[in-house]
Structures are given as structure tokens and as C-alpha cells.
């Protein structure tokens, strides 16, 4: 028998057994007992990616087009499913209980087993998502600061917030699932050599910027609610708010900087053309023979991949 508080739970048309069997107390206990693991994961991640760059320095790049298609497709499917199972809870709470409940009451974990299960998977998914960087290293694409900084901070913050049952995290989870649904679908198509319209990449970056703005706004509301009602009514810590707003603000600055350079800078080219042109020029300058010069077309493709990656540099 399904044991959920119907008053704060949307009317799911179907609930899977693995969702109904979810017990949030067990997962929280495990996260609390193993909270130090996240720092080991981050340390190993840094060693692998920067060590991998050194390893690949004098080796030819891998194409990995097939694995990349599968990788992006799986992440897109996971994100779509996650959005479909968590967004109804947020909408239901906003409609029937208002903004305060959506920011201050963690019913999405404590009373809703469906949303609680997909919240747990969301946190766990930040570990395999580190694999994005493996493709960058093996394909010898630029590893920009935003990429690895984002991966590490999201993993640590997600783990930390889950142990606290941070109530405002329902917003962050739904937004991340939704944006990743579009983003990974787009990159799966790009990896498969389909060519979605150019404006799609601009829309994705705009969605990422909107995600950061909303994230900052939610934290401002949470801070106000916390000061007005206290921790007894608003289940979020001041430390969490401070960390979250610092994280979202830094993401916004980094994404806004890219957006300006890619789409708005006077006299600038689109990011793909810039990367392809620079790659081609670099090869021509370094080539001293016709055979070497003929390799420029391969580097142009690498430049296009670089630009595609820069647009992907994620949010979380």
C-alpha cells in the first residue's frame, strides 16, 4: 500500500514499485555516515583529469563519437525522466501551498516518495556526470575552469544539502533536470552529426542563465523567510543559503561572460566559427609541409567540438 501524505503530493498517474519502496531515512543516514567520501571523489577526479591531460599531451585525440552519442542520450533520458517525476511536485506545492512552502518545507523528500526517490538519484547522478570530463580529456578539448569547478561544487553542495534535507533544493533539482533534458538531447544530436538550428544553442545558454538567476532569487527569498520565521518553520540553514548564493552567483558571472563573448560582443563571430578559425590558423602556422597542412580540417572539427563543449559547460 502506498504510504504518502496525499495533501502535499500530486496525483501521480502511476508509481513504480522502486519509487514506492523508497525510504528517505535510510539514504540520509548513509549520506551522513559517508559524507567524507565526496572529498575523496573530488580529489580522484582532479588527479584523473589533469593527469589525463598530461598523458594525452603527445598522443592523438580520440574521436569517441559512438560512446559520446550513447553517453549524452542516456543522460538526456535520465534528465527527462527526472524532470517528469519531480516537476509535478513543485507545481502542486506552488498551486496549493504557495512560495513559502516550496522554499521552506521539505515535503518533497519527507512526504513524497516519488520525488524523494528522484531527489536521491539526482544527488547520486553527480558522480557519473564527472565522466563528461573524460570525453573532454580524451578528445583533447580545452578544459576550461567553469567545467571542473562546476562539477566539483555541484557534487559537494548536492551531497551537503541532502544531508540537511534543504527545502529550497526542490527548486534547484527541478531546474537542473529540465535544463539538462534539453542540453543533453541537443548534444546527443550534435554527436550523431545532426545539425539543430544555431539558435538552439543560444536558447540553451539562456536557459542556463535563467537557472542561475532563479537560483539566486530563491536563496534571497529563503534568507528572508528564515529571518522572519526561524529554522522551526523554514527548514534551511543560513550556511546553506550562503553557500548556494555564492555558487549560483559565480555560475551566473561565468555563463554571462560566455554568453556575451559568443553572441553579443561587437564584431565578434559565433563561438563555433571563432573556435574553428583559430584552430585552422594554428595548424597552418605550425604546418611546414603540405601533408601537415592537410590535417587542418581535422583541427577545424576539433574547434567546432570545442565551441560545442563551451556551450555545454553546464549548469547544474
Swiss-Prot record:
Q: Into which EC class is this enzyme placed?
A: transferase
E.C. number(s) listed in UniProt = 2.3.1.199
State the Gene Ontology BP annotations.
fatty acid elongation; fatty acid elongation, monounsaturated fatty acid; fatty acid elongation, polyunsaturated fatty acid; fatty acid elongation, saturated fatty acid; long-chain fatty acid biosynthetic process; sphingolipid biosynthetic process; very long-chain fatty acid biosynthetic process
Q: In which tissues is it expressed?
A: Detected in the CNS (central nervous system) of third larval instar (at protein level). Expressed in cyst progenitor cells (at protein level). In the adult fly, expressed in several tissues including, sperm, follicular epithelium, nurse cells and cyst cells.
| Task of the protein | Catalyzes the first and rate-limiting reaction of the four reactions that constitute the long-chain fatty acids elongation cycle. This process allows the addition of 2 carbons to the chain of long- and very long-chain fatty acids (VLCFAs) per cycle. Condensing enzyme that elongates fatty acids with 12, 14 and 16 carbons with higher activity toward C16:0 acyl-CoAs. Catalyzes the synthesis of unsaturated C16 long chain fatty acids and, to a lesser extent, C18:0 and those with low desaturation degree.
- Family, per entry: Belongs to the ELO family. ELOVL6 subfamily.
Instruction: Look up the record and name the pathway of this protein.
Output: Lipid metabolism; fatty acid biosynthesis
UniProt-recorded name of the protein: Very long chain fatty acid elongase 6
MF terms (GO), sorted A to Z: fatty acid elongase activity
Q: What happens when the gene is disrupted?
A: RNAi-mediated knockdown in larvae confers resistance to tunicamycin. RNAi-mediated knockdown reduces ER stress response caused by the accumulation of unfolded protein in the ER by reducing Ire1 and PEK/PERK signaling. RNAi-mediated knockdown in imaginal disks results in lethality. RNAi-mediated knockdown in cyst cells results in abnormal sperm cell development with abnormal organization of individualization cones.
Task: Give me the glycosylation sites of this protein.
Answer: 11, 242
Mention any Pfam family matching this sequence: ELO
Q: Where is it chiefly localized?
A: mitochondrion
Q: How does it sit in the membrane?
A: Multi-pass membrane protein
Against InterPro entries, the record matches this protein to: ELO_CS, ELO_fam
Q: Transmembrane stretches, by residue range?
A: 30-50, 64-84, 117-137, 142-162, 167-189, 202-222, 245-265
**Location within or outside the cell:** Mitochondrion outer membrane; Endoplasmic reticulum membrane
Under PROSITE patterns, the record lists: ELO
Mention any one GO cellular component term assigned to this protein in its UniProt record.
Answer: mitochondrial outer membrane
**Catalytic activity from the UniProt record:** a very-long-chain acyl-CoA + malonyl-CoA + H(+) = a very-long-chain 3-oxoacyl-CoA + CO2 + CoA; hexadecanoyl-CoA + malonyl-CoA + H(+) = 3-oxooctadecanoyl-CoA + CO2 + CoA
Highest taxon, organism lineage: Eukaryota
Gene behind this protein: Baldspot
Keywords recorded for this protein, A-Z: Endoplasmic reticulum, Fatty acid biosynthesis, Fatty acid metabolism, Glycoprotein, Lipid biosynthesis, Lipid metabolism, Membrane, Mitochondrion, Mitochondrion outer membrane, Transferase, Transmembrane, Transmembrane helix
Amino acid at each position: 500500500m502506498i504510504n504518502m501524505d496525499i495533501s502535499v503530493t500530486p496525483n501521480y498517474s502511476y508509481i513504480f514499485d522502486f519509487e514506492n519502496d523508497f525510504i528517505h531515512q535510510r539514504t540520509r543516514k548513509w549520506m551522513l555516515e559517508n559524507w567524507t567520501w565526496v572529498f575523496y571523489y573530488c580529489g580522484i577526479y582532479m588527479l584523473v583529469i589533469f593527469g589525463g591531460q598530461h598523458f594525452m599531451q603527445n598522443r592523438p585525440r580520440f574521436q569517441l563519437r559512438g560512446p559520446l552519442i550513447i553517453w549524452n542520450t542516456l543522460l538526456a533520458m535520465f534528465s527527462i525522466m527526472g524532470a517528469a517525476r519531480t516537476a509535478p511536485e513543485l507545481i502542486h506545492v506552488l498551486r496549493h501551498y504557495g512560495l513559502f512552502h516550496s522554499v521552506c518545507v521539505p515535503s518533497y523528500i519527507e512526504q513524497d516518495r516519488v520525488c524523494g526517490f528522484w531527489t536521491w538519484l539526482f544527488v547520486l547522478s553527480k558522480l557519473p556526470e564527472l565522466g563528461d570530463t573524460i570525453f573532454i580529456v580524451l578528445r583533447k578539448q580545452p578544459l576550461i575552469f567553469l567545467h571542473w569547478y562546476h562539477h566539483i561544487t555541484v557534487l559537494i553542495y548536492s551531497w551537503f544539502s541532502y544531508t540537511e534535507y534543504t527545502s529550497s533544493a526542490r527548486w534547484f533539482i527541478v531546474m537542473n533536470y529540465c535544463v539538462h533534458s534539453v542540453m543533453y538531447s541537443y548534444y546527443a544530436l550534435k554527436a550523431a552529426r545532426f545539425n539543430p538550428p544555431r539558435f538552439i544553442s543560444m536558447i540553451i545558454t539562456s536557459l542556463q542563465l535563467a537557472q542561475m538567476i532563479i537560483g539566486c532569487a530563491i536563496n534571497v527569498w529563503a534568507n528572508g523567510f528564515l529571518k522572519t520565521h526561524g529554522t522551526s518553520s523554514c527548514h534551511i540553514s543560513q550556511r546553506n543559503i550562503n553557500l548556494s548564493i555564492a555558487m549560483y552567483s559565480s555560475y551566473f558571472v561565468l555563463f554571462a561572460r560566455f554568453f556575451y563573448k559568443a553572441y553579443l560582443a561587437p564584431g565578434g563571430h559565433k563561438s563555433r566559427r571563432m573556435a574553428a578559425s583559430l584552430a585552422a590558423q594554428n595548424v597552418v602556422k605550425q604546418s611546414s609541409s603540405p601533408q601537415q597542412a592537410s590535417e587542418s580540417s581535422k583541427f577545424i572539427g576539433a574547434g567546432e567540438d570545442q565551441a560545442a563543449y563551451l556551450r555545454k559547460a553546464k549548469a547544474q
